[in-house]
Design a protein with these regions (language model features):
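N-proximal low-complexity "stem/linker" segments adjacent to membrane-targeting elements
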Residues: 1-33
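Acidic donor-binding segment of Leloir-type glycosyltransferases
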Residues: 23-64
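Glycine-rich, basic loop-to-helix element that forms the pyrophosphate-binding segment
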Residues: 64-81
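Short aromatic/hydrophobic "clamp" motif used to bind/position activated sugar donors
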Residues: 86
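Conserved donor NDP-sugar-binding/catalytic core segment of glycosyltransferases
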Residues: 97-131
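A short, conserved alpha-helix in the catalytic core of glycosyltransferases
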Residues: 151, 157-161, 168-197
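Active-site donor/metal-binding and catalytic loop motifs
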Residues: 171-175, 192-213, 222-225
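Non-catalytic, C-terminal membrane-associated alpha-helical segments of glycosyltransferases
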Residues: 213-262
């Protein structure tokens, strides 16, 4: 009798009670498991709204958290995953299953790598940002624009190093940016290693919290990320970043306030 194939990768969705119906994983596959973490502080009845496309599947597990915070939600998924690999997800992401399999193959070939920071397209089929032309080591510099749905992690490695999302950052927190970059930075600073490459694993619409620039709140939120990652070196790093991105920060004055963390 042939042994059943064990799932190798979990898609870990973070969503809210009023949006959980939007979750749309790839078709069922023996290698795939799905976890959906539902933020539901109001304790509303979201289960009755689930479409058959979710309820009829045998590979989906739901968890509920009675609190806001996407980082909390992603940590719940990280704790619950039972597969070697985990790819984080939002409820408006469409995944490319062949691309995910390509990402698994890259990590299989490099067992010392704790994660792959992959690539994504927008709804028009365009790459969402500049990605390296080939697979390169993950660094503090090239992981600065990390998006959660690009992060394919080796679960035992990140758990062994105690890497989690900092719940003071990310959507639903006052510091609503930076949770992904901080995760990557913490992995690297803990002695871990990662890969970054042009393997397209997802499609995500162009508009997101990571694409907002120019407001005072945005500038301050970005400044705090540098404090968290670079500590006492943060002002110097912010200065270099601010000079490069002064237009997005609101001109020279905005870049100066950013450098000072204001």
């Amino acid at each position: 009798m042939t042994e059943p194939v064990a799932a190798r990768v979990t898609l870990g969705y973070s969503t809210t009670a009023d949006r959980v119906r939007n979750v749309a994983p790839p078709p069922e596959d023996p290698l795939l498991a799905v976890i959906v973490s539902v933020q539901n502080p109001s304790e509303t009845d979201w289960r009755s709204t689930l479409p058959e496309s979710l309820t009829a599947r045998g590979d989906v597990t739901f968890f509920e958290q009675v609190a806001w915070g996407v980082a909390k939600s992603r940590n719940l998924v990280l704790d619950a995953a039972e597969t070697e690999y985990l790819l984080f997800a939002d409820d408006d992401v469409e995944f490319d299953w062949p691309g995910i399999l390509e990402g698994l193959a890259l990590l299989d070939a490099d067992p010392g790598a704790g994660m792959l920071l992959a690539a994504a397209r927008d709804e028009h089929g365009r790459l969402r940002k500049d990605y390296p032309a080939s697979v390169v080591p993950l660094t503090l510099r090239n992981s600065g624009k990390a998006a959660t749905y690009e992060m394919l992690v080796r679960v035992p490695d990140v758990r062994a190093r105690g890497i989690r999302f900092d719940e003071r950052f990310g959507a639903g927190a006052e510091n609503y940016l930076g949770d992904e970059y901080i995760f990557c930075a913490d992995l690297l600073k803990a002695g871990g290693r990662g890969l970054h490459g042009p393997v397209v694993v997802a499609m995500h619409p162009d508009d997101s919290s990571g694409s907002r620039w120019g407001t005072d709140a945005d500038r301050r939120a970005r400044a705090v990320i540098f404090d968290r990652v670079f500590g006492w070196k943060a002002p110097a790093v912010r200065l270099a970043f601010g000079l490069r991105r002064r237009a997005e920060l609101g001109g020279v004055g905005g870049a100066l306030r950013f450098t000072l963390g204001r």
